[in-house]
Amino acid sequence: MRRLGSVQQKIPCVFLTEVRDEPSRKRDCQQFQVVATENVSPAALASDVHCAAATEKVDGTCCYVTTFNGEPYLWARLDRKPTKQADKRFKKYQYSQKTCKGFVWNVNEDFREVPEFWMAAHRVQHENGHPVPDEHGHIPGWVPVDHTNKQYCWHSSVVNYGTGVALVLKTHGEDEGQLEIVSVPLADLMEQTLELIGTNVNGNPYGLGSKKHPVHVLVPHGVLRIRNPPAVEFQQICSWFQECQEGRVEGIVWHCDDGMLIKIHRHHLGLKWPVADTFLNTRPVVVHVDESDADPCASEKDLFKSFSSVNRQTFSSVRDIQFEP
């Protein structure tokens, strides 16, 4: 399978969108809703979205693998966001104008400080050598995941820098009907973006692990192909989400041949998410994590140790993975 596009900016909706005067279903305290119209966006058409590879949009937090201090490293998504005052001005403008276009930022004063090693995502535009915000008022970027930073403890649980590996959920070989959790060298994931999912991420829509035994894994973007995707047409996509088992997902991301990524989220269509019995949980999963991938000095709650204890075992779904008490 060819490596699909990496997420280095906010992904645009496949349809043109409009702003409605109703509370957001996605963001608390946002008094307007961004919804899809029935018109496919010109950008999607220009990238030939009808011929693109359709993949499952996974609900987690975005990560990136690239070098840090000369070694392959996991980086966490951290958008540089406006100050409260600047954000208030931006939202007021967006609400009154029904668009973000035309709003003027003062990049030097309107944005919060970021950690020392923060870097802007690759596709962020620059003016006068400085990264500038996207249409949502954010500057997408990354920070390296350090084991000493408790803010990123769930990120760090899926990487072992000592052995240079990460815990990855993907399809099992050529069998897209089965999943596997495997330890993958970070060097093999270089310049890829992945989604961290699990017990303590985004409300855990897939039901992984428990408070006693949290479970987190990385899912490479584009790895979960949609075998029978709907045509890129408003009503067909709505029906697919509501009527097909394969449609019990957060959304679709189309990977176009020119590298462009296009998405649709259930919220764009006024549909509920999360849903019961997600499609991710309809497939069995086999574990391939060897004891040598774990740090011998780590605690018994170390994820690599936990997964190595069930090495070569198959579970009916990712939410059914259980470790010995």
Swiss-Prot record:
Single biological process term from Gene Ontology: RNA repair
PTM description: AMPylates itself (auto-AMPylation).
Record EC number: 6.5.1.3
InterPro entries: RLIG1
Cofactor dependency: Mg(2+); Mn(2+)
Superkingdom in the source lineage: Eukaryota
A single GO molecular function term of this UniProt record: RNA ligase (ATP) activity
Keywords: ATP-binding, Ligase, Nucleotide-binding, RNA repair
Function: Functions as an RNA ligase, in vitro. The ligation reaction entails three nucleotidyl transfer steps. In the first step, the RNA ligase reacts with ATP in the absence of nucleic acid to form a covalent ligase-AMP intermediate and release pyrophosphate. In step 2, the ligase-AMP binds to the nucleic acid and transfers the adenylate to the 5'-PO4 terminus to form an adenylylated intermediate. In step 3, the RNA ligase directs the attack of the 3'-OH on the 5'-phosphoanhydride linkage, resulting in a repaired 3'-5' phosphodiester and release of AMP.
PANTHER family: CHROMOSOME 28 C12ORF29 HOMOLOG, RNA LIGASE 1
Protein name: RNA ligase 1
Organism annotation: Danio rerio (Zebrafish)
